[in-house]
Amino acid sequence: AWLAELGMEGRDIVKERIEKSLSGAKTWVLIGGPPCQAYSLVGRSRMIGEDKGKYEKDPRHFLYREYLQILADHRPTVFVMENVKGLLSAKLNQQSTFKKILADLQNPSLAMSGTTQGKNLSYKLFSISRRGSGNLFNEPDPGDFVVRSEEYGIPQARHRIIILGIRSDVYVSDPDLLQITQKV
């Protein structure tokens, strides 16, 4: 295991370290998430209160692209990305940050380079806690990705966004949902 702060380590170092760790493995899972300060309600209100222009220019809005780069470079079979619930309401230049992240996660090579560069890489995205509230095209509603930990036996009321991505070329069927358990 390696704990790295994406955005602080150089991309070449991250790429080399992951390649070495994978040792040619074709089936693996990436678990992690970008820093949440730019998306958390507390962080946003503090920054917007100080200076809205400063908030709009905060480079932490784009740290999720470091995660995308790992997806594009290493093509994990499955990924699990976690972040704070405040991401659902975060906006940058009047655009939903969450919807942009979802679109980018579906096609990380395209998002990172503007082209697939011969890589046909795409992911199907899933909620692990809810299904069926999306539109006619079976696209999930952003709220579907919120996991309410207290509904799954965890003794705290912490709500998190969790996105499960399965590489399209290995996708067979939708994953099972978490089962609600008795509260602790």
What are these regions (language model features)?
Residues L30-I31, E151:
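Short glycine/serine/threonine-biased micro-segments
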Residues K26-V29, V78:
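Structural motif
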Residues I31-G33, L164:
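Structural recognition of the conserved hydrophobic beta-strand(s) that form the central parallel beta-sheet
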Residues G33-P34, R75:
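Hydrophobic alpha-helix-in-membranes signature
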Residues K20-S21, V42-V184:
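Class I S-adenosyl-L-methionine
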Residues A1-T27, K99, A103-L110:
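Glycine-rich phosphate-binding loop and adjoining beta1-alpha1-beta2 segment
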Residues Q37:
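Active-site beta-alpha loop architecture of Rossmann-like, nucleotide-cofactor-dependent enzymes
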